[in-house]
């Protein structure tokens, strides 16, 4: 029976499927199924074993603190049914699993994550990383605090035991001792808190420096918002804000130093309070003394107190070093500001010069001479140069300014702030110098400066004198500036003076005397005592001046030069005179003069002349028109330069010059280089009456280069002329001198060494002095004459109308006349007598040059003293051009 039961049990076992041994891995939450070996398989003797495992489709769940997020679980699916029913055999006892087998089985059961799951895990890791840093920061903060709470709890327990044990003592001695102990305990607690605050303050900068960039991520995580990956890191943003703060606010450095000092005092006081037994007020005071004086910590006792005091003293030394650096920088910056000319000029009635050029030296000289009579003045120069450089250039002039102060400021005349810095609204005169560049750019800059001056809100008290480079740009500047603008066209002034000096040798020296303030110059003034007098009487009413014209009040202030003798001076009229200074002349009683008998000689007729232009100027068309008005018919103008003939015709036509409409002169074109000898030798240099060496347009931007070419041309022409002696066509010379038979001065100028009159245009006044001393040229015209004209117009804007008329080809002009027109040889006359005789020719005699003197005398003194005159003398007159 028992045997049958055993067999039936064996049959039941054989009919059942193979048992699965299940082993659970608690750490990985996995379930491993191990199937016993099948007896039908060949494993060793009986066959091989087959292992089957059942897994669910869920993802492996890692703890959240490891960085990989968990997914929701899915229901476990039952294993699929086997394809074949197992053979009902009694399996052998399975071999127990070893440790190695267990590891192999476990590793084989771990699923390999796909690429998408890896990316998802990385994103989850990057998202949870701020939490990790937040936990770290919280741990750093909470661990000391928890230790402090534990310490305080222990203290409270001890206090409780002490209080319970000393109740009898407290009842006998009162509550005073208990209160003191409680206060001591409170102080100990506060010192502990102070110590933790100090430690936390020391650790906080390092933590912020390390993890400051993660703070926005933590904030975004707490707010449940997505972070912007393109945001600038917080560390860079803070550095940028600090940089902007120090750049914008001028007192940022001082404020930062003050905050650092207060922080060091407060931090040091807190640290001292934590390590000493004193009060908080005493700790703060000691902290201040350590900051102010590093030697105060020498007497401290105790290790903690010494460490804290030394640290505070070191910080104090650093702060005081920073303070000294800031003070030194502030002083240096202020000194540099003063040295560089950035401070404001507080002046009134000064002359303001805008710009910088080679004319500035002679301009300052003339203005200083003009201010000599009033004890000096103030001249302010505003230019786009360093103040030190300007002052060095002015010091090189080696000129005595005679009490006049020259103040230089660095800035741009185009900026209103710089104009206000030099008190532009309070200046009595403003001079705008042309820039050292081509004419169009220079005039365009002058126009912008005039617009800037017109934009001054306070208005302008004085007038503006603008130096122009091109005559065509003058109307535009006057249109923009209005009545306050007076223009001086430098190129045009020199060109017209060159023509006048070429036709009348010696006239340049006279113009130099009249335009400069060293001798006689023009003045306009009202004299009420001269009202109702005829002009012929006014002419001899000034012992120390020579009247030249009248400013007619009834005609809108028009200046009439050389008026009619019968003109009666009316109320409001002013008299134009030539005098040494504005305070050196006054009307006096009428002197006794005698007209007498004198020769009535008419002006000789004009004869054709031959003139050579070497070089090409921008305004050469204007010079040709002036020559057309001055020269006699049949004259020739030779033009020798490198500009092709067709290009010349085009430029002359652009200047509105009708070449075929010229009646008095004939243009002869020659192409060549004026600094090459063989080109000059092709010209009949010995046949010209006058040779004008012009500053060439191609090199006008460089003063030194232009002067070098002019000097080379001058020397070559003189050498060629000397080699061609004794041949000379004297026709033109004899024709010119026929009307001046006794004029030894003109003969001396023209026939010296049998050479033509050469007028050179030298731009630099220093080069001009060298040429004048060497006497290789009859006369040299330079920018110094333009500077004189600018200074004269700056002193009185009305003089500009006088100069414009005298420089023009029409109207009154300055001439040199021989003595035979006014007297007989060795006749004894005073200067007043000669002035009266000159009125019969509608001329105003303003000076003379004696035969034995080199320079002419304008506005001579002692006009009523008679003297003997020679026919070799010449007189300087203002004559009508009719």
From Swiss-Prot:
Listed Low complexity bias regions: 107-117
Domain of life according to the entry: Eukaryota
Protein's membrane topology: Multi-pass membrane protein
Transmembrane segments: 129-149, 192-212, 255-275, 307-327
Keywords: Coiled coil, Ion channel, Ion transport, Membrane, Nucleus, Transmembrane, Transmembrane helix, Transport
Boundaries of every RCK N-terminal domain copy: 348-489, 608-757
Main location: nucleus
Coiled-coil annotated residue ranges, if any: 378-403
SUPFAM superfamilies: NAD(P)-binding Rossmann-fold domains, Voltage-gated potassium channels
Disruption phenotype: Loss of microbial symbioses. Undergoes typical root hairs growth deformation in response to Nod factors, but exhibits no calcium spiking and nodule formation.
A single Gene Ontology CC term: nuclear membrane
Subcellular location: Nucleus membrane
Compositional bias of kind Polar residues: 48-62
Inducing or repressing factors: Not induced after bacterial or Nod factor treatment.
Extent of Pro residues compositional bias: 78-95
UniProt region (Disordered), positions on chain: 1-122
Keyword Chloroplast: no
Free-text domain note: The N-terminal domain (1-76) is sufficient, but not required, to target DMI1 to the nucleus.
Family: Belongs to the castor/pollux (TC 1.A.1.23) family.
Function: Required for early signal transduction events leading to endosymbiosis. Acts early in a signal transduction chain leading from the perception of Nod factor to the activation of calcium spiking. Also involved in mycorrhizal symbiosis. May be involved in the regulation of the calcium channel responsible for calcium spiking by mobilizing another cation, and thereby altering the membrane potential.
UniProt name for this protein: Ion channel DMI1
Gene expressing this chain: DMI1
């Amino acid at each position: 029976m028992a045997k049958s039961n055993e067999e039936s049990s064996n049959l039941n076992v054989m009919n059942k499927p193979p048992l699965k041994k299940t082993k659970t891995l608690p750490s990985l939450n996995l379930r491993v199924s191990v199937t016993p070996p099948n007896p039908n398989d060949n494993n060793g003797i009986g066959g091989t074993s087959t292992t089957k495992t059942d897994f669910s489709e869920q993802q492996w769940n890692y703890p959240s603190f490891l960085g990989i997020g968990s997914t929701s679980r899915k229901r476990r699916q039952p294993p699929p049914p086997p394809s074949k029913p197992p053979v009902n055999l009694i399996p052998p006892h399975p071999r127990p699993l070893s440790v190695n087998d267990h590891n192999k089985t476990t590793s084989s059961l771990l699923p390999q994550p796909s690429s998408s799951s890896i990316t998802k895990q990385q994103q989850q890791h990057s998202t949870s990383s701020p939490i990790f840093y937040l936990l770290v920061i919280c741990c750093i903060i909470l661990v000391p605090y928890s230790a402090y709470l534990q310490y305080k709890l222990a203290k409270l327990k001890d206090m409780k035991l002490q209080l319970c044990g000393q109740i009898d003592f407290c009842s006998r001695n009162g509550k005073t001792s208990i209160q003191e102990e409680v206060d001591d305990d409170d102080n100990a607690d506060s010192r502990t808190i102070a110590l933790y605050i100090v430690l936390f303050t020391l650790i906080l900068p390092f933590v912020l420096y390390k993890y400051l960039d993660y703070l926005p991520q933590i904030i975004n995580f707490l707010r449940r918002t997505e972070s912007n990956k393109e945001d600038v890191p917080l560390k860079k943003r803070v550095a940028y804000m600090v940089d902007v703060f120090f750049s914008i606010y001028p007192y940022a450095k001082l404020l930062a130093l003050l905050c650092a000092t207060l922080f060091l005092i407060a931090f040091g006081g807190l640290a001292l309070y934590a390590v000493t037994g004193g009060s908080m007020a005493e700790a703060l005071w000691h902290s201040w003394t350590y900051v102010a004086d590093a030697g105060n910590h020498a007497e401290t006792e105790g290790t903690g107190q010494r460490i804290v005091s030394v640290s505070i003293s070191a910080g104090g030394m650093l702060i005081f070093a920073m303070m000294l650096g800031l003070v030194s920088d502030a002083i240096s910056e202020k000194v540099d500001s003063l040295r560089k000319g950035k401070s404001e000029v507080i002046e009134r009635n000064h002359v303001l010069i805008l710009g910088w050029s080679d004319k500035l030296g002679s301009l300052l000289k003339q203005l200083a001479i003009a201010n000599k009579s009033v004890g000096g003045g103030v001249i302010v120069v505003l230019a786009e140069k360093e103040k030190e450089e300007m002052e060095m250039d002015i010091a090189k002039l080696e000129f005595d300014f005679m009490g006049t102060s020259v103040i230089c400021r660095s800035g741009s005349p185009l900026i209103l702030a710089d104009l206000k810095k030099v008190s532009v609204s309070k200046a009595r005169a403003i001079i705008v110098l042309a820039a050292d560049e081509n004419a169009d750019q220079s005039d365009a800059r002058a126009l912008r400066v005039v617009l800037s001056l017109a934009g001054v809100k306070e208005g302008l008290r004085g007038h503006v004198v603008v130096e122009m480079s091109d005559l065509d740009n003058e109307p535009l500047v006057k249109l923009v500036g209005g009545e306050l603008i007076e223009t001086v066209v430098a190129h045009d002034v020199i060109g017209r003076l060159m023509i006048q000096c070429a036709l009348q040798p010696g006239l340049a020296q006279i113009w130099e005397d009249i335009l400069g303030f060293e001798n006689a110059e023009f003045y306009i003034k009202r004299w009420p005592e001269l009202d109702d007098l005829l002009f012929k009487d006014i002419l001899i009413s000034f012992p120390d001046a020579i009247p030249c014209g009248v400013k007619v009040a009834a005609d809108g202030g028009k200046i009439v030069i050389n008026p009619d003798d019968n003109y009666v001076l009316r109320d409001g009229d002013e008299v134009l005179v030539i005098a040494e200074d504005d305070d050196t002349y006054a009307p006096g009683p009428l002197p006794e003069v005698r007209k007498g008998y004198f020769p009535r000689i008419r002006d000789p007729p004009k004869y054709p002349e031959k003139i050579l232009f070497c070089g090409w100027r921008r305004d050469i068309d204007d010079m040709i028109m002036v020559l057309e008005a001055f020269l006699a018919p049949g004259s020739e103008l030779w033009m020798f330069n490198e500009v092709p003939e067709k290009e010349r015709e085009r430029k002359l036509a652009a200047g509105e010059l009708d070449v075929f409409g010229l009646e008095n002169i004939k243009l002869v074109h020659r192409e060549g280089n004026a600094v090459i000898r063989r080109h000059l030798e092709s010209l009949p240099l010995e046949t010209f009456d006058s040779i004008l060496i012009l500053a060439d347009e191609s090199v006008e931007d460089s003063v030194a280069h232009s002067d070098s070419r002019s000097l080379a041309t001058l020397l070559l022409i003189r050498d060629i002329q000397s080699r061609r002696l004794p041949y000379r066509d004297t026709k033109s010379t004899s024709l010119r001198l026929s009307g001046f038979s006794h004029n030894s001065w003109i003969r001396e100028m023209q026939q010296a060494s049998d050479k033509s009159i050469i007028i050179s245009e030298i731009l630099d006044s220093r080069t001009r002095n060298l040429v004048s001393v060497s006497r290789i040229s009859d006369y040299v015209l330079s920018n110094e004459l333009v500077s004189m004209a600018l200074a004269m117009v700056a002193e009185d804007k009305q003089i500009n109308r006088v100069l414009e008329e005298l420089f023009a080809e029409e109207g009154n002009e300055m001439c040199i006349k021989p003595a035979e027109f006014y007297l007989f040889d060795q006749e004894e006359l005073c200067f007043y007598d000669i002035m009266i005789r000159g009125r019969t020719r509608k001329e105003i005699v303003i000076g003379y040059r004696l035969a034995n003197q080199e320079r002419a005398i304008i506005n001579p003194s002692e006009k009523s003293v008679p003297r003997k005159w020679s026919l070799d003398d010449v007189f300087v007159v203002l004559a009508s051009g009719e």
